[in-house]
Design a protein with these regions (language model features):
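Extended, Lys/Glu-rich alpha-helical coiled-coil stalks
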Residues: 160-190
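Extreme N-terminal "head/tail" segments of very large remodeling/mechanoenzyme assemblies
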Residues: 1-156, 181
Protein backbone atom coordinates (compact mmCIF):
# COMPACT_ATOMS: atom_id res chain seq x y z
CA UNK A 1 0.00 0.00 0.00
CA UNK A 2 1.32 3.42 -0.98
CA UNK A 3 1.94 5.96 1.73
CA UNK A 4 -0.28 9.04 1.19
CA UNK A 5 1.62 12.23 0.45
CA UNK A 6 1.31 15.68 -1.04
CA UNK A 7 2.87 16.04 -4.48
CA UNK A 8 3.49 18.94 -6.83
CA UNK A 9 1.53 18.24 -10.00
CA UNK A 10 2.05 21.48 -11.92
CA UNK A 11 3.67 24.88 -11.66
CA UNK A 12 2.62 28.04 -13.44
CA UNK A 13 4.99 30.96 -13.99
CA UNK A 14 3.80 34.30 -15.38
CA UNK A 15 6.46 37.03 -15.83
CA UNK A 16 9.42 35.65 -13.90
CA UNK A 17 12.98 35.89 -15.21
CA UNK A 18 13.09 35.23 -18.94
CA UNK A 19 9.75 33.39 -18.73
CA UNK A 20 6.63 35.26 -19.87
CA UNK A 21 4.22 32.35 -19.43
CA UNK A 22 5.00 28.70 -18.73
CA UNK A 23 3.15 25.70 -17.30
CA UNK A 24 5.41 22.94 -15.97
CA UNK A 25 4.12 19.42 -15.27
CA UNK A 26 5.76 17.33 -12.57
CA UNK A 27 6.10 13.57 -12.24
CA UNK A 28 5.15 12.07 -8.89
CA UNK A 29 8.57 10.56 -8.22
CA UNK A 30 11.41 12.13 -10.20
CA UNK A 31 11.84 15.47 -11.94
CA UNK A 32 15.07 16.36 -13.68
CA UNK A 33 16.05 19.93 -14.47
CA UNK A 34 18.76 19.92 -17.10
CA UNK A 35 20.02 22.31 -19.73
CA UNK A 36 22.87 24.53 -20.76
CA UNK A 37 24.11 27.39 -18.64
CA UNK A 38 21.57 30.22 -18.79
CA UNK A 39 18.67 27.98 -19.88
CA UNK A 40 16.52 28.78 -16.81
CA UNK A 41 17.13 25.94 -14.32
CA UNK A 42 17.96 28.30 -11.44
CA UNK A 43 15.16 30.63 -12.51
CA UNK A 44 12.57 27.87 -11.99
CA UNK A 45 14.16 26.64 -8.74
CA UNK A 46 14.28 30.17 -7.32
CA UNK A 47 10.59 30.64 -8.22
CA UNK A 48 9.74 27.47 -6.28
CA UNK A 49 11.73 28.74 -3.29
CA UNK A 50 9.90 32.09 -3.26
CA UNK A 51 6.59 30.23 -2.88
CA UNK A 52 7.76 27.49 -0.50
CA UNK A 53 9.77 29.74 1.83
CA UNK A 54 7.17 32.51 1.67
CA UNK A 55 9.94 35.07 1.45
CA UNK A 56 11.08 37.65 -1.09
CA UNK A 57 14.50 37.94 0.55
CA UNK A 58 17.45 37.44 -1.79
CA UNK A 59 18.93 35.18 0.93
CA UNK A 60 16.79 32.31 -0.38
CA UNK A 61 17.85 32.71 -4.01
CA UNK A 62 20.65 30.80 -5.74
CA UNK A 63 23.72 32.95 -5.10
CA UNK A 64 25.89 30.72 -7.31
CA UNK A 65 23.89 31.96 -10.30
CA UNK A 66 24.75 35.64 -9.66
CA UNK A 67 27.18 37.25 -12.08
CA UNK A 68 29.35 40.35 -11.80
CA UNK A 69 26.72 42.67 -13.33
CA UNK A 70 23.58 41.27 -11.73
CA UNK A 71 22.85 40.17 -8.19
CA UNK A 72 19.69 38.12 -8.17
CA UNK A 73 16.70 39.55 -6.33
CA UNK A 74 12.99 38.92 -6.60
CA UNK A 75 12.58 42.30 -8.31
CA UNK A 76 15.32 41.49 -10.85
CA UNK A 77 13.58 38.18 -11.61
CA UNK A 78 10.23 39.95 -11.99
CA UNK A 79 11.72 42.50 -14.37
CA UNK A 80 13.42 39.74 -16.35
CA UNK A 81 16.93 41.15 -15.84
CA UNK A 82 19.45 39.87 -18.39
CA UNK A 83 23.23 39.44 -18.12
CA UNK A 84 23.82 42.39 -20.47
CA UNK A 85 22.03 44.77 -18.07
CA UNK A 86 18.76 44.97 -20.02
CA UNK A 87 15.41 43.68 -18.72
CA UNK A 88 12.47 42.03 -20.48
CA UNK A 89 9.98 44.04 -18.41
CA UNK A 90 12.19 46.94 -17.34
CA UNK A 91 10.11 49.89 -18.50
CA UNK A 92 6.50 48.74 -18.08
CA UNK A 93 3.92 48.15 -15.35
CA UNK A 94 3.08 44.45 -15.06
CA UNK A 95 1.71 41.67 -12.86
CA UNK A 96 3.28 38.30 -12.16
CA UNK A 97 2.39 34.98 -10.53
CA UNK A 98 4.23 31.88 -9.40
CA UNK A 99 1.82 29.07 -8.49
CA UNK A 100 2.34 25.48 -7.33
CA UNK A 101 -0.48 22.98 -7.70
CA UNK A 102 -0.39 20.34 -4.94
CA UNK A 103 -2.40 17.10 -4.80
CA UNK A 104 -3.00 14.90 -1.77
CA UNK A 105 -2.50 11.34 -3.11
CA UNK A 106 -4.89 9.84 -0.54
CA UNK A 107 -7.86 12.19 -0.98
CA UNK A 108 -7.00 13.63 -4.41
CA UNK A 109 -7.81 17.08 -3.04
CA UNK A 110 -5.94 19.71 -5.02
CA UNK A 111 -4.78 23.03 -3.62
CA UNK A 112 -2.83 25.84 -5.24
CA UNK A 113 -0.36 28.02 -3.35
CA UNK A 114 1.37 30.97 -4.89
CA UNK A 115 2.72 34.47 -4.91
CA UNK A 116 1.32 37.37 -6.93
CA UNK A 117 3.17 40.59 -7.67
CA UNK A 118 2.36 44.00 -9.13
CA UNK A 119 5.35 46.02 -10.32
CA UNK A 120 5.27 49.61 -11.58
CA UNK A 121 7.89 50.74 -14.10
CA UNK A 122 9.44 53.17 -11.61
CA UNK A 123 9.65 50.75 -8.68
CA UNK A 124 13.13 50.34 -7.24
CA UNK A 125 12.00 47.84 -4.63
CA UNK A 126 9.16 45.36 -4.24
CA UNK A 127 6.04 47.21 -3.05
CA UNK A 128 2.92 45.18 -3.94
CA UNK A 129 2.79 41.44 -3.51
CA UNK A 130 0.78 38.79 -1.73
CA UNK A 131 0.94 35.09 -0.99
CA UNK A 132 -2.28 33.17 -1.57
CA UNK A 133 -3.85 29.74 -1.67
CA UNK A 134 -7.07 28.41 -3.10
CA UNK A 135 -8.80 25.08 -3.49
CA UNK A 136 -8.89 23.32 -6.82
CA UNK A 137 -6.58 23.22 -9.78
CA UNK A 138 -4.90 26.08 -11.60
CA UNK A 139 -7.73 27.80 -13.51
CA UNK A 140 -8.11 27.04 -17.22
CA UNK A 141 -7.17 30.62 -18.11
CA UNK A 142 -3.87 30.11 -16.23
CA UNK A 143 -4.31 33.38 -14.31
CA UNK A 144 -4.47 35.35 -17.57
CA UNK A 145 -7.17 37.71 -18.81
CA UNK A 146 -6.70 38.65 -22.47
CA UNK A 147 -3.14 37.25 -22.20
CA UNK A 148 -2.34 39.63 -19.31
CA UNK A 149 -1.50 38.12 -15.89
CA UNK A 150 -4.07 38.69 -13.13
CA UNK A 151 -3.70 41.63 -10.76
CA UNK A 152 -3.68 41.03 -7.01
CA UNK A 153 -7.35 42.13 -6.95
CA UNK A 154 -8.20 39.44 -9.53
CA UNK A 155 -6.28 36.82 -7.51
CA UNK A 156 -8.22 37.88 -4.40
CA UNK A 157 -11.52 37.57 -6.30
CA UNK A 158 -10.60 34.07 -7.55
CA UNK A 159 -9.59 33.03 -4.04
CA UNK A 160 -12.89 34.26 -2.62
CA UNK A 161 -14.87 32.46 -5.36
CA UNK A 162 -12.96 29.23 -4.77
CA UNK A 163 -13.65 29.43 -1.02
CA UNK A 164 -17.36 29.09 -1.85
CA UNK A 165 -16.98 26.44 -4.57
CA UNK A 166 -17.75 22.72 -4.44
CA UNK A 167 -14.01 22.22 -4.96
CA UNK A 168 -13.28 23.76 -1.56
CA UNK A 169 -12.07 21.15 0.91
CA UNK A 170 -13.55 23.20 3.78
CA UNK A 171 -16.94 23.60 2.10
CA UNK A 172 -18.79 22.32 5.18
CA UNK A 173 -17.34 25.21 7.14
CA UNK A 174 -18.35 28.72 6.19
CA UNK A 175 -15.21 30.71 5.59
CA UNK A 176 -15.99 34.38 6.00
CA UNK A 177 -12.43 35.66 6.20
CA UNK A 178 -9.50 35.22 3.87
CA UNK A 179 -6.00 35.98 5.01
CA UNK A 180 -3.54 37.61 2.65
CA UNK A 181 0.05 38.16 3.68
CA UNK A 182 1.17 41.55 2.43
CA UNK A 183 4.63 42.87 1.73
CA UNK A 184 4.83 44.32 5.24
CA UNK A 185 4.93 40.76 6.56
CA UNK A 186 1.78 41.42 8.58
CA UNK A 187 -1.51 39.62 8.08
CA UNK A 188 -4.57 41.48 6.93
CA UNK A 189 -7.98 39.87 7.27
CA UNK A 190 -10.57 40.43 4.55
Amino acid sequence: MKQPKKIFTRMLINNWGGISHKMLEFHEYVNLFSGKSGSGKSTVMDAIQVVLYGSVSANFLNKAADDSKNKRSVLSYLRGAQKDGTANRGDVDFCSQIVLEIEDTATHIVTCVGAAFEVAKGDTDLKKYTYFSHSGRIPKDEYLENNVPYSIAQIRKLTEERSRSADNRGRGIRRKKLIFIRCTGKSSVR
